[in-house]
């Protein structure tokens, strides 16, 4: 059972800890739709400096919602870098080209890894629940399965 009051208290703590407040107006929204397949997400309006953190109240895939909360807030913290890099990719590559696809995929994968690493660092230092979620990892192929069927290079 999700303890919404506890998560809302952690939301207040983390918006201050990450120095997002008072620069940004940020709210937390619980998603009650069982068909929503994410654990968390964020909507950002840079013009008005407003953001909405969305958390799955029905069927979250991650065990530690504090980790998810910090992860989504890190996306807001890094959003200026996200926007500049995306603009550079769009201005230097033709949309749909191989270079565009490579740059876009590489950037967003690296951004996601960076957000997650920063989340882990802050969570392990300042989090109330320092246990990392392994929900998505459990659905991935094993190392052996990834290489099963590849030809021997010798």
Annotate the PLM regions.
Residues 2-63, 80-154:
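Metalloprotease/metallohydrolase-associated module, dominated by Zn2+-dependent proteases
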Residues 67-80:
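Active-site recognition of the HExxH zinc-binding catalytic motif
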């Amino acid at each position: 059972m999700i303890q919404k009051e506890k998560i809302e208290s952690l939301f207040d703590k983390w918006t201050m800890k990450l120095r997002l407040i008072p620069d940004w107006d940020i709210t937390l929204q619980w998603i009650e739709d069982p068909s929503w397949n994410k654990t968390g997400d964020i909507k950002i309006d840079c013009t008005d400096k407003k953001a909405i953190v969305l958390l799955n109240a029905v069927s979250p895939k991650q065990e530690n919602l504090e980790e998810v909360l910090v992860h989504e807030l890190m996306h807001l913290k890094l959003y200026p870098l996200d926007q500049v890099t995306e603009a550079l990719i769009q201005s230097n590559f033709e949309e749909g080209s191989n270079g565009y696809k490579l740059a876009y995929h590489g950037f967003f994968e690296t951004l996601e890894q960076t957000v997650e690493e920063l989340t882990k660092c802050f969570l392990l230092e300042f989090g109330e629940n320092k246990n990392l979620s392994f929900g998505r990892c459990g659905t991935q192929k094993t190392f052996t399965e990834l290489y099963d069927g590849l030809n021997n290079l010798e």
